[in-house]
Amino acid sequence: MSYSTSEMMTVAAARRLRNGAVCFVGIGLPSKAANLARLTSSPDVVLIYESGPIGAKPSVLPLSIGDGELAETADTVVPTGEIFRYWLQGGRIDVGFLGAAQVDRFGNINTTVVGDYHAPKTRLPGAGGAPEIAGSAKQVLIILKQSPRAFVDKLDFITSVGHGEGGDSRQRLGLPGEGPVGIITDLCIMEPEAGSHEFVVTSIHPGVTREQIIAATGWAIRFADDVRQTTAPSEVELAALRDLEARTAAAHGQTAGEA
């Protein structure tokens, strides 16, 4: 069965969520991957959204954290303050699942501005709860499409800290948890190198070359000694993803695949 690079990215990201994990989910690509995991490999994953739903099981992907679908399908809904103070800062979030406009080699995220902060070329959507998720979740996964504009050598602004300047930078900042443990793109999967915490390519998606990855990265990307090939999406995974996208498109008046 044929599939797109975006579908490969979403499936690869979904596989990273273990069954039973408590996951703080960002809107957009993270939500799509997390809900695909819930519908396939990890039916007991607990999805938490910033607006207060715990155990959300949306039949269509939410447009925002305030989408009623999240509250209506959740096991319970609590105040936002409880989500951050009790669940996140209390060490009860296993995985924070985040998107990004830009990321650097140490998994730091920019969702604020491109260019000078006071006179930016582009004003991005902003932080939301991402800085707190990146700082306090036990682990963080990042999903975004790969290009030199998105994978940059130096961020104009660090919205959410990953591994800081590398090495023991995160520990020196006093941030709990492991920080980012994976960056999943439409070309490959990257993981932090032991010691330096610089992200290196550990798995390449089928049909993708090293040259493509190098060309799509704004720094001198390195490859692990043992680089795997990502397992292609199964028919079950693709069917679940496409059904989810079709339901979402019908509900929101979109074209399937835009969801």
Language model segments and positions:
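Alpha-helix capping and helix-coil boundary motifs
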Residues: 4-5, 79, 118, 255-259
